[in-house]
Amino acid sequence: MTTEQRRSLQAFQDYIRKTLDPTYILSYMAPWFREEEVQYIQAEKNNKGPMEAATLFLKFLLELQEEGWFRGFLDALDHAGYSGLYEAIESWDFKKIEKLEEYRLLLKRLQPEFKTRIIPTDIISDLSECLINQECEEILQICSTKGMMAGAEKLVECLLRSDKENWPKTLKLALEKERNKFSELWIVEKGIKDVETEDLEDKMETSDIQIFYQEDPECQNLSENSCPPSEVSDTNLYSPFKPRNYQLELALPAMKGKNTIICAPTGCGKTFVSLLICEHHLKKFPQGQKGKVVFFANQIPVYEQQKSVFSKYFERHGYRVTGISGATAENVPVEQIVENNDIIILTPQILVNNLKKGTIPSLSIFTLMIFDECHNTSKQHPYNMIMFNYLDQKLGGSSGPLPQVIGLTASVGVGDAKNTDEALDYICKLCASLDASVIATVKHNLEELEQVVYKPQKFFRKVESRISDKFKYIIAQLMRDTESLAKRICKDLENLSQIQNREFGTQKYEQWIVTVQKACMVFQMPDKDEESRICKALFLYTSHLRKYNDALIISEHARMKDALDYLKDFFSNVRAAGFDEIEQDLTQRFEEKLQELESVSRDPSNENPKLEDLCFILQEEYHLNPETITILFVKTRALVDALKNWIEGNPKLSFLKPGILTGRGKTNQNTGMTLPAQKCILDAFKASGDHNILIATSVADEGIDIAQCNLVILYEYVGNVIKMIQTRGRGRARGSKCFLLTSNAGVIEKEQINMYKEKMMNDSILRLQTWDEAVFREKILHIQTHEKFIRDSQEKPKPVPDKENKKLLCRKCKALACYTADVRVIEECHYTVLGDAFKECFVSRPHPKPKQFSSFEKRAKIFCARQNCSHDWGIHVKYKTFEIPVIKIESFVVEDIATGVQTLYSKWKDFHFEKIPFDPAEMSK
């Protein structure tokens, strides 16, 4: 077996683990596996299940050195009936298996219905081609000994591991043949991505149906129907609706062709208003002329949501709708797609990039631009970059026609304004940025709006912190000791950061760590070995300080147990990695205090008063209304996990079924939720059965379609006035409540200031709406001219690339990685390094999430090879036929060879060196 095959097997092991039950192929692997290894694998399956058994099987498999075992493994898969897995490994193409994931998600969701409605013995013969022979025998045996429901559960387990690409369709046919009612739920023609949650819910006899284009519940516009929402048929879902009067009021200025900001509360149906405007706009063109609409969504989940909404709404009109996001842009000809479609849903950076490249020559190609969450149009946000282009075209006297501009928002905001005049200026500046001459709000149909949008009652709860905090005392002592060790290595530690008077367990301390780490990355000494030793040591000390600081923040807001578990996980990972002398010393110091920390965290007297108050609120609200649906907003992902664990472990809250919703995280970190995971959670939350409380970070603030809830809790969570209005707007049901729970009086004060600013914003909008339109336009033009003058005066000439060769050093240990002369650029944005010398500088490990993107297949992660460093440098990919590393500049320090000056860059675009395109011919040298 070649090294490449071994690496590929490691890279794709997640697919194998999810599919293979190794006990079915062990008999075929007898020539290569020892008897005790076979027993270990069988025991692992019996104790922990097939996935853990597959993990152990792969471990033993990859340790084999005998000739021919890889072919033996493939033959074993073939003989046992794993034809799909065999084909995928033979070609190293797992696309067919990956496509099954959406059906697995659907089956998991429908599992309770499946178990109660399916009689496995009726359909097993029709499904035999989708299952392993041994699986069929086991299912029939379980049906015989334990009953049909247990057999159905086993059938689900087997289908979830099936590698046959046709199993979803085969299951459908088998169900239809038996006239089983479950076939109505099992929709395979389009897959779960295209199946409306509402259809499933309707057939599963739940009553909380959301109309397909729903940004908010009011989008149903079912006021004209006499039947309740649960009785609305599929035909009604996609037929034309009669808009409410307040929606027509919001749409009217835009329908008259005016550039408009539509400012209306979350829950009123702004998405539906945008559909009305778009439809009116496209229909107004005479024969032979056509409009072209672009709708901008700022976040990928919102983009996916709106693309689906527009596609379904306009398919009955014969308009062509498509979408391009950052995830798909590399694989599509943007210019052609824009040219060939009537409505294009975009993430804004796509248009910014293509305007720069010239693939889209100007905004004149569009006739209408709609900006969702348009309050973001400021500073260097992509929305503003698009509007800079628009305003340059407008003020530069370009002959090309400009598109109409529509902005949608729940709150225009007031920035840092302290009075109505300053708020007025801020709003005028936003109008100037969007070239809007009208702010549309509901004035004449307020009563109707108030019947649809329910403003929740707001409550502030100030809770005392723990009276004494032994946990914090112990951790603070460990942090002081760690700081002292760092000062022994670097006596100038205090001078590496301008931040003074830092306090443990605060955001300010986190900022101090960041500035110290940046400073030590460019710290220089004549003795380079000593420089490397000091920089690496400081990096380790500050990394441990960061984890201690995180733990203090978790303890302050959750349980001491959660904070301690966080630290135990960290030190467990430290032991599994390089574990040099410094890490051994720091780990030993922690372990010396571990027993005391365990004792403190178990002491009932150390319960967090904030959690006790949160528990009281939840008990009280669910007692008053057992059907309560809650969103609990928190600041960090770590706190999301901690509060979920607390709820699940609290017998007083056994009535709660928590789900979590967090952002996607950084691409170079294994944190955050994937888009499918976010969608799955939101669908489950809307179903009002799988989860009755959603614990969320700020990702739930803005734009994402979240079902009605009647309780919003802001747990130490506050932002600006826009964030306040959006989070409060999540409480959409009649009689909803919003609690702000905090131990910090300053948080309550900030929220009260936000409430004052909201009133100031509303008053300012009312004042603006009384202005003469010509006067307002003149004001807007003055701001635009002034802002363009400032922009032009600040415009910098395009930097000249530096042709001098430079070193790239590992940011953690300062080891030489490569020279810029060896760096090559692929497709203008990916950076690889040529030459065998660089290969000796890194080690590879299987990527936890291998996947295909554009012309690349992500296979492994690469790390600094220097002993006890292992700093993350990037990834190893297959590009066309080449196996190459792809590095990220944020992992390196750039050193000028001539002067020795060291510089940090967070993005390649900021590093102006001579960028040589990748040439395949160089790979053969």
From Swiss-Prot:
A motif (DECH box) lies at residues 372-375. GO terms for cellular component: actin cytoskeleton; bicellular tight junction; cytoplasm; cytosol; ribonucleoprotein complex; ruffle membrane. Residues 735-925 are annotated as: Mediates interaction with RNF135. Keywords: Acetylation, Antiviral defense, ATP-binding, Cell junction, Cell membrane, Cell projection, Cytoplasm, Cytoskeleton, Disease variant, Helicase, Host-virus interaction, Hydrolase, Immunity, Innate immunity, Isopeptide bond, Membrane, Metal-binding, Nucleotide-binding, Phosphoprotein, Repeat, RNA-binding, Tight junction, Ubl conjugation, Zinc. Innate immune receptor that senses cytoplasmic viral nucleic acids and activates a downstream signaling cascade leading to the production of type I interferons and pro-inflammatory cytokines. Forms a ribonucleoprotein complex with viral RNAs on which it homooligomerizes to form filaments. The homooligomerization allows the recruitment of RNF135 an E3 ubiquitin-protein ligase that activates and amplifies the RIG-I-mediated antiviral signaling in an RNA length-dependent manner through ubiquitination-dependent and -independent mechanisms. It is found in: Cytoplasm; Cell projection, Ruffle membrane; Cytoplasm, Cytoskeleton; Cell junction, Tight junction. InterPro entries: CARD_dom, CARD_RIG-I_r2, DEAD/DEAH_box_helicase_dom, DEATH-like_dom_sf, Helicase_ATP-bd, Helicase_C-like, P-loop_NTPase, RIG-I-like_C. It comes from Homo sapiens (Human). Changing residue 55 to I: No IRF3 signaling activity. No effect on dsRNA binding. The modification (Microbial infection) Phosphoserine is found at residue 8. Changing residue 788 to R: Decreased polyubiquitination. Loss of function in RIG-I signaling pathway. Decreased ubiquitination and function in RIG-I signaling pathway without effect on RNA-binding. Coiled coil: none annotated. Changing residue 164 to R: Reduction of ubiquitination. Reduction of INFB induction. The gene is RIGI. Changing residue 154 to R: Reduction of ubiquitination. Reduction of INFB induction. Residues 610-776 form the Helicase C-terminal domain. This is Antiviral innate immune response receptor RIG-I. Changing residue 268 to F: In SGMRT2; results in constitutive activation and enhanced interferon-mediated signaling. Its EC number is 3.6.4.13. ATP binds at residues 264-271. Its main location: cytoplasm. GO terms for biological process: antiviral innate immune response; cellular response to exogenous dsRNA; cytoplasmic pattern recognition receptor signaling pathway; defense response to virus; detection of virus; gene expression; innate immune response; positive regulation of defense response to virus by host. Residues 251-430 form the Helicase ATP-binding domain.
